[in-house]
Structures are given as structure tokens and as C-alpha cells.
Design a protein with these regions (language model features):
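Phosphate-interacting basic helix/loop segments used at nucleotide- and nucleic-acid interfaces
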Residues: 256, 260
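A cross-family phosphate/adenosyl-ligand binding-site feature
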Residues: 6-9, 13-116, 120-201, 205, ...
Length: 271
């Protein structure tokens, strides 16, 4: 009886796993690849139904990524990056459309993460969202928006990239780096450390969305719940993430989740 029971349990488990939503996370450009590398370290991709991809025009950066799934885009870039020019990042994605179409196939939820303002991520993220959307995936972008100190050109590039994403994404979560300075202790950090705080929020946002769909909790959110929320939304979203334990954990987690709205209003982005 025991072998049969164990075999039946394995069949049920395999069946349940086959019904899990196929989630693909695409880290695009330097910031996106940094995020996807962190997600790998956090073991987000331990299950077969959540897969991560590192996508870049910079061959050296891809070589340093621990992910198995890597895509070097842009023949004319020759693996040397996009030089901070989003039009070159977009051209690289167009040149590598066959490879990108292959990795966006058979996807139910596509999460595209990148830093807005540079070349590869800003230019290629919208194209990847378009390909995923064309093949029937629900698309969510999780991106950062530049600090004011990064200059007008990077903010202009970021607006360009966000507009491309708006055309093809169901929802965009924007993490405004400037808002990080409102968090106690961040304002006095060196700029490199402040960037890492932004990267951490990027990683936590993606993990939060993926784990809501794949991890049991007191209140379960399934794929159709998420689809309903997104379909009736405005395309602009906010996410708050909090975690706590012990007495008062509900209040503590709620306060942590409200520390930073990780998606600003359009006015916040413009400012």
C-alpha cells in the first residue's frame, strides 16, 4: 500500500506543479542583470515554473552572471554595451528578435526588470514586453527611475523608456530612486550604497509578486486574481512589502510596507 500511496502523492504533486503559472523574469541591461543575479542568490528560480533570464549588450556582464539562461543581444554592439544610448539598446533587441521571441514563448506572466535612464535596459525592455505580450503573456515591468543628481539626460532617457513600456505592459512598478532619500539613514549614504538600496527594493518587489502566486499564505492570491486586479487597474501600480515576526508583527509589517511607495504617480516621476 505504501509504495502505491507514495506514487499517488507524487502524481498529485507533479500535476499541481504542472498547473502552476509559468513565470519568466527578464533582467535587462546592467541594473536588470544585477537584480536577476540577486534573485538567483535568493533562490527565486528553485522551482521549474519560475525562470530567470539575463539579457544584455555587455558580454562581460553576462559572463559574470550565475544564471544559466543568458542572451547577448545586438550583433552591431559586439558585446561592448550600448554606451548609455537607449536607441542602441532598442536596435540591439530588434537585431536579436528571434532569440528574444524564443525565450518569451510559452509564458503566462512576464516580469521585465531594468533600470531606466541608461542604454540597454531602457532601450530593450519595451521590446521584450512587446514580444511577451504578443504571445499572450500578462506583462509587468519593475523598473527604477534615476536620482535627480544623475542629470537631465538620464531622466529624459528614462521617460522615453517608460513610454515604450506603457505601450506593452499591463502594469508598471516604478521605484523612484529620489524617494529613497526619504528613508531614514539613506540620505547620508554614499551614492553607490544608495543605488544598492534601490536594487534591493527592485528585488523585493519582484520576489513579492512571484511568491504571492507560488507560496501558500493565510490569504492566497492565484494567477486569475492577479489578472483581475491588473485588468481593472490603470496600468500604474504601487506595491508595499513588509515582513515581521513576534508580538505586533501585523502593525510592524504594515508600517514597513508603507515606508516607500514603490510606484509614484506620473507627477512624482516628472518631478
Amino acid at each position: 500500500h505504501y509504495p502505491l500511496r507514495r506514487q499517488r502523492q507524487m502524481c498529485i504533486r507533479d500535476r499541481l506543479e504542472s498547473l502552476q503559472p509559468r513565470i519568466r523574469v527578464y533582467g535587462v541591461g546592467g541594473a536588470g542583470c544585477n537584480a536577476i543575479n540577486r534573485l538567483f542568490e535568493e533562490r527565486l528560480f528553485k522551482n521549474s515554473y519560475v525562470t530567470g533570464y539575463a539579457i544584455n549588450t555587455d558580454a562581460q556582464a553576462l559572463l559574470m552572471s550565475p544564471l544559466e539562461e543568458k542572451v547577448l543581444i545586438g550583433r552591431t554592439a559586439r558585446g561592448r554595451g550600448a554606451g548609455g544610448d537607449p536607441t542602441k539598446g532598442e536596435a540591439a533587441a530588434l537585431e536579436s528578435e528571434i532569440a528574444l521571441r524564443r525565450i518569451t514563448n510559452d509564458t503566462q506572466l512576464a516580469i521585465i526588470t531594468a533600470g531606466m535612464g541608461g542604454g540597454s535596459g531602457t532601450g530593450a525592455a519595451g521590446h521584450i514586453a512587446r514580444l511577451a505580450k504578443q504571445q499572450g503573456a500578462m506583462t509587468i515591468a519593475v523598473v527604477t527611475y534615476p536620482f535627480n543628481s544623475e542629470g537631465a539626460l538620464r531622466k529624459q532617457n528614462a521617460e522615453w523608456g517608460l513610454e515604450k513600456l506603457r505601450e506593452h505592459c499591463d502594469t508598471i512598478l516604478v521605484i523612484p530612486n529620489e524617494r529613497l532619500l526619504e528613508i531614514e539613514g539613506v540620505k547620508d549614504l554614499p551614492i553607490g550604497d544608495a543605488f544598492r538600496v534601490g536594487d534591493e527594493l527592485l528585488v523585493r518587489s519582484i520576489t513579492g509578486v512571484a511568491e504571492m502566486l507560488t507560496t501558500d499564505g493565510m490569504v492566497n492570491l492565484d494567477f486569475e486574481d492577479l489578472r483581475t486586479v491588473i485588468q481593472f487597474g490603470s496600468g500604474v501600480a504601487m506595491i508595499g512589502l513588509g515582513e515581521a515576526s513576534g508580538p505586533g508583527r501585523v502593525e510592524a509589517a504594515t508600517q514597513e510596507a508603507c515606508l516607500l511607495y514603490t510606484s509614484p504617480s506620473p507627477r512624482d516621476v516628472e518631478e
